[in-house]
Amino acid sequence: MTVGLGMPQPPAPTLAPRRATRQLMVGNVGVGSDHPVSVQSMCTTKTHDVNSTLQQIAELTAAGCDIVRVACPRQEDADALAEIARHSQIPVVADIHFQPRYIFAAIDAGCAAVRVNPGNIKEFDGRVGEVAKAAGAAGIPIRIGVNAGSLDKRFMEKYGKATPEALVESALWEASLFEEHGFGDIKISVKHNDPVVMVAAYELLAARCDYPLHLGVTEAGPAFQGTIKSAVAFGALLSRGIGDTIRVSLSAPPVEEVKVGNQVLESLNLRPRSLEIVSCPSCGRAQVDVYTLANEVTAGLDGLDVPLRVAVMGCVVNGPGEAREADLGVASGNGKGQIFVRGEVIKTVPEAQIVETLIEEAMRLAAEMGEQAPGATPSGSPIVTVS
């Protein structure tokens, strides 16, 4: 039996067809049902610190981020947008709250899109016409970003709290104002920190419009909790074709958000799979320390960006079968490991040599695929300096 490397051809099917939407361009990244679901993150730097912000954007880009958002709370941040947008490797979205003048500054600076929060921008309804005209002239989209924590007080008073209906009504009200001014390049988010409320809001929104949807669980929490919340919510929606771009919100470095986002999309066959480690959860049958083995293999292959499935199995029950189905694998037992490549046993090695052997074979397979191994390029994060 021969198992081919990488993703099957044609690509594995998804659970549901994408919801049909209008199409937008955020810089060179398409957003909408005709385009792949994209991954976003947001810089944690002070935007006016241009070098630090560009450095973080470079790190996010290297991690697989498609679109990046930057905060713009002060004039000095608005003044830095043009330089950031000019030097960023990926499209930059300006995140605007409170001051409408920063919307126009972001458009003039060449940002690829602007996110507006209708719940806290002063007298925003009365400025929509100006914003629509400026964004239309620049050819950039607007994201109407409704958030449970800053919901427009009119809808808070009407519904009593940030219900799915309140979030959706707020978003569609603002969208209707833009449409009245002939502007339709809109994407929408209706974020809540409760994934159940968030999913209900996006389901309602998806049924009522054809705008592309930006998915997010706001204030999701620390890395572990936030990952679970986001994965549950995104999986519930994306598996039914709802969602066109995602941002995982974590109290963690932004690169971790990108890693989680990419893994969610890969798990749903919405993005070509990269390196995947398959390992058993261990039990009383395990004859090796599976946890340590899997962690050491993962660490040794960190940075290897190939569609390669590596199975690390701890016993003879499921081990041989899983190892055969992977591109590369080991079935361990009795102080040794059988190494499988493309479904065939190529060697048996002592337990102490399993990690080293798996890494060597992974590098060899990567070379066959024309990929560079970790360390083949200068190590460390990309360095960006703007003088």
Curated annotation (Swiss-Prot):
Recorded protein name is 4-hydroxy-3-methylbut-2-en-1-yl diphosphate synthase (flavodoxin)
Could you read off the lineage of the organism from its UniProt record? Answer: Bacteria, Bacillati, Actinomycetota, Actinomycetes, Mycobacteriales
**NCBIfam families the UniProt entry points to:** ispG_gcpE, PRK00366.1
Q: Which UniProt keywords apply?
A: 4Fe-4S, Iron, Iron-sulfur, Isoprene biosynthesis, Metal-binding, Oxidoreductase
Any one Pfam family here would be GcpE
Hey, which family's this protein in? Belongs to the IspG family.
- Quote the record's cofactor note: Binds 1 [4Fe-4S] cluster.
Q: What are the BP-aspect GO terms?
A: isopentenyl diphosphate biosynthetic process, methylerythritol 4-phosphate pathway; terpenoid biosynthetic process
- Top EC class for this record: oxidoreductase
UniProt EC number? 1.17.7.3
Record-annotated residues binding [4Fe-4S] cluster? 280, 283, 315, 322
Its recorded reaction(s) are: (2E)-4-hydroxy-3-methylbut-2-enyl diphosphate + oxidized [flavodoxin] + H2O + 2 H(+) = 2-C-methyl-D-erythritol 2,4-cyclic diphosphate + reduced [flavodoxin]
The pathway entry for this protein reads as:
Isoprenoid biosynthesis; isopentenyl diphosphate biosynthesis via DXP pathway; isopentenyl diphosphate from 1-deoxy-D-xylulose 5-phosphate: step 5/6
Q: Which SUPFAM superfamilies match?
A: Dihydropteroate synthetase-like, Nitrite and sulphite reductase 4Fe-4S domain-like
A GO molecular function for this record? Answer: 4-hydroxy-3-methylbut-2-enyl-diphosphate synthase activity (flavodoxin)
Keyword tRNA-binding on this protein? no
Cofactor(s) annotated in UniProt: [4Fe-4S] cluster
What is the organism field in this record?
Answer: Mycobacterium bovis (strain ATCC BAA-935 / AF2122/97)
What job does this protein perform? Converts 2C-methyl-D-erythritol 2,4-cyclodiphosphate (ME-2,4cPP) into 1-hydroxy-2-methyl-2-(E)-butenyl 4-diphosphate.
InterPro entries referenced in this protein's UniProt entry, alphabetically: Dihydropteroate_synth-like_sf, IspG_bac, IspG_bac-typ, NO2/SO3_Rdtase_4Fe4S_sf
